[in-house]
């Protein structure tokens, strides 16, 4: 089983990782710095997301140090590139704790990276806030675990709940669904949730397959789905797969009534630039969009700072997917340190579990299993994208409509899919 397999990896996996220390903005604080260690995907398929998260974290670090640090000490981030390779993760966290002897650790990005860290974290008894990772703690049930992903108390179905709710509300209601997923931890979890949502709404599953993560040709998969003739298609995929799926669907002129769901990558500017109008009609999850009702105290100031530095840092120019969340999840740890006046993992975990935190993405409260007490997962539809669309298009809301949840809804779905093409 995936989660158990990674417990056997050791420090040797770090050999290929790259250590980097973020600069400190303040030097006036006394004492040794408080060190916070983590792995982040800075190369490999998830680098476009990992790099923007890192910049968000570095901005937090600089802001904290400019105000005097924490507990009268400066803060220093200590991080390794996990290369989007789960096998590096146990070794990285072992080295951070046993060799680098960091004061605290924080989680990596993505389910496939967070899960293999858990045995090390649990053995060491460390508080562990991860960035995005779907249902990572479902089997471990570790009481010091917290997830910044807004998937809520029932994480697996949350990624596609809005997708299925939207489909079920159409008249006539679609009857059949195809489910397709990469054979990887996140995609399998999301697709398990999609099955739950399909059953909830009485959809008949006519296609349910997984494909190898190394797949590059998605035309045969799309043809197989076409042959099953589903009304709607839910896809659970990672970035390069998502791009390949969108291209294959358009190249084959496939037009189900609704398509999308849990496709990682479509949120990133680099992939939106690549796909442009091919995205029209797709319905997919987002975790934050620049809508007025999702702008909180500090949101605009953060993104102004992030975007002014993005080009020099070689990261996503907008940072909407993970830049803000990178800032938010480490700010929770920082606020807990300040409130408890402590670096004790037990005290920090107890405080985090009981407290509602104010972040640049709004107030966040954790519930059972360290998941959000209430889901904040969005489903949006892309539409009206013209050839040559670029960053000024992606900067705003004209090309996307929030369909769910109701408190963030900005419009209604264009249905069926071909009407938005």
Q: What is each model feature region?
A:
Residues 29-31, 55-77, 168-169, 199-202:
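Signal peptide-proximal N-terminal region
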Residues 150, 249-327, 338, 394, ...:
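Extracellular/periplasmic periplasmic-binding protein-like sensory domains
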């Amino acid at each position: 089983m995936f989660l158990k397999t990674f417990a056997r990896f050791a420090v040797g996996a770090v050999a290929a990782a790259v250590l980097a220390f973020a600069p400190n903005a303040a030097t006036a604080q006394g004492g040794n710095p408080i060190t916070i260690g983590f792995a982040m995907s800075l190369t490999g398929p998830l680098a476009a997301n990992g790099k923007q998260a890192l910049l968000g974290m570095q901005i937090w670090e600089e802001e904290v140090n400019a105000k005097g640090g924490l507990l009268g000490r400066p803060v220093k981030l200590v991080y390794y590139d996990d290369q989007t390779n789960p096998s590096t993760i146990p070794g990285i966290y072992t080295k951070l704790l046993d060799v680098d002897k960091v004061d605290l650790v924080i989680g990596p990005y993505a389910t496939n990276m967070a899960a293999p860290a858990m045995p090390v974290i649990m053995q060491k008894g460390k508080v562990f806030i991860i960035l995005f990772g779907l249902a990572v703690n479902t089997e471990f049930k570790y009481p010091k675990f917290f997830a910044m992903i807004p998937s809520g108390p029932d994480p697996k179905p949350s990624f596609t709940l809005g997708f299925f709710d939207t489909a079920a509300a159409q008249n006539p209601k679609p009857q059949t669904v195809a489910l397709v997923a990469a054979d990887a931890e996140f995609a399998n979890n999301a697709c398990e949730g999609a099955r739950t949502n399909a059953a909830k709404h009485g959809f008949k599953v006519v296609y349910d397959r997984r494909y190898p993560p190394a797949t590059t040709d998605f035309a045969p998969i799309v043809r197989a789905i076409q042959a099953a003739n589903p009304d709607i298609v839910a896809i659970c995929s990672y970035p390069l797969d998502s791009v390949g799926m969108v291209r294959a669907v358009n190249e084959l002129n496939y037009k189900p009534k609704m398509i999308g769901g849990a496709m990682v990558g479509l949120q990133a500017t680099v992939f939106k630039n690549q796909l442009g109008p091919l995205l029209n009609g797709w319905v997919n999850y987002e975790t934050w969009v620049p809508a007025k009702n999702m702008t909180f105290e500090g949101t605009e100031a953060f993104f102004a700072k992030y975007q002014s530095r993005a080009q020099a840092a070689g990261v996503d120019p907008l940072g909407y997917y993970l830049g803000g969340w990178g800032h938010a999840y480490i700010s929770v740890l920082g606020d807990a340190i300040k409130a408890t006046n402590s670096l004790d993992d037990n005290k920090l975990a107890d405080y985090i579990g009981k407290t509602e935190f104010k972040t640049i993405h709004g107030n966040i409260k954790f519930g059972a299993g360290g998941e959000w007490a209430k889901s904040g997962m969005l489903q949006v539809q892309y539409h009206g994208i013209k050839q040559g669309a670029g960053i000024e298009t992606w900067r705003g809301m004209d090309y996307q409509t929030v369909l769910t949840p109701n408190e963030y809804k900005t419009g209604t779905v264009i249905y069926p899919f071909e009407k938005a093409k």
